[in-house]
């Protein structure tokens, strides 16, 4: 695969920012790794980082390049700061950047598919929250969305109290940022395939169960992995992202 560190200016954020991108490359003589690519623009996974991380973290803490190579999958890992992928009250318009500006820049910079059936989103912790929020608010964009140890109940989570003032001001997150509210109002027939994974030792496990209860009450089918041991750490995420990639409905596989 090609590993691209892409620095660019964001008109939405009004600052230079970055993304890490993996692009498929067909390889035959590389020792220990076989890459897959064809003439068609490859499917693309938007892979979001957590609260304390950046656009490089997935490539530094997991073998995402190795896992994606055999699937012919492009992976876009944007910088999201500590924004919860929202338009911050005291900060940047990260939601607008992620959902409007970034896909346009990706398609202009790189040869990747823009078809819904070839487009996926996933993330861990804050990124898991962001992935489901994007899928619930723009279901027509994605074929599948996955949350790994996601912060799925930001309204009730006391651990996020320090983040709320910067992102949402003095009040609680609004309905457009509340995943419990979004899933309760979602049209099950319009949604992409959804997957939620969270280890039983994770401090966010109870929040994941609450969100899954709300999804079931709405009649939404979700692939779940919430009964397996695991904590809020990279050992769990490295293993689980492999399961997610195997689950994605990648064409021709």
Model-derived segments and spans:
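Non-catalytic cap/lid and distal C-terminal segments of serine-dependent acyl enzymes
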Residues: 1-253
């Amino acid at each position: 695969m090609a590993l691209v560190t892409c620095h660019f200016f964001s008109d939405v954020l009004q600052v230079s920012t970055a993304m890490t991108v993996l692009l498929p490359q067909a390889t035959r003589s590389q020792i220990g790794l076989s890459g897959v690519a064809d003439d068609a623009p490859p499917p693309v996974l938007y892979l979001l980082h957590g609260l304390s991380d950046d656009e490089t973290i997935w490539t530094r803490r997991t073998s995402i390049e190795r896992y994606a190579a055999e699937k012919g999958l492009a992976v876009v890992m944007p910088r999201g700061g500590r924004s919860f992928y929202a338009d911050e009250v005291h900060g940047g318009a990260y939601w607008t950047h992620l959902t409007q500006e970034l896909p346009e820049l990706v398609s202009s910079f790189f040869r990747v598919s823009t078809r819904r059936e070839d487009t996926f989103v996933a993330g861990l912790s804050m990124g898991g929250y962001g992935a489901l929020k994007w899928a619930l608010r723009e279901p027509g964009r994605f074929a599948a969305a996955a949350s790994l140890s996601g912060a799925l109940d930001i309204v009730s989570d006391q651990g996020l109290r320090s983040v709320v003032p910067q992102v949402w001001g003095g009040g609680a997150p609004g309905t457009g940022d509340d995943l419990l509210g979004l899933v309760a109002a979602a049209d099950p027939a319009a949604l992409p395939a959804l997957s939620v994974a969270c280890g039983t030792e994770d401090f966010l496990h109870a929040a994941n169960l609450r969100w899954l209860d709300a999804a079931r009450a709405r009649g939404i089918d979700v692939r779940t992995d919430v009964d397996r041991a695991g904590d809020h750490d990279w050992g769990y995420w490295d293993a689980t992202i492999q399961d997610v990639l195997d689950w994605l409905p990648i064409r021709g596989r």
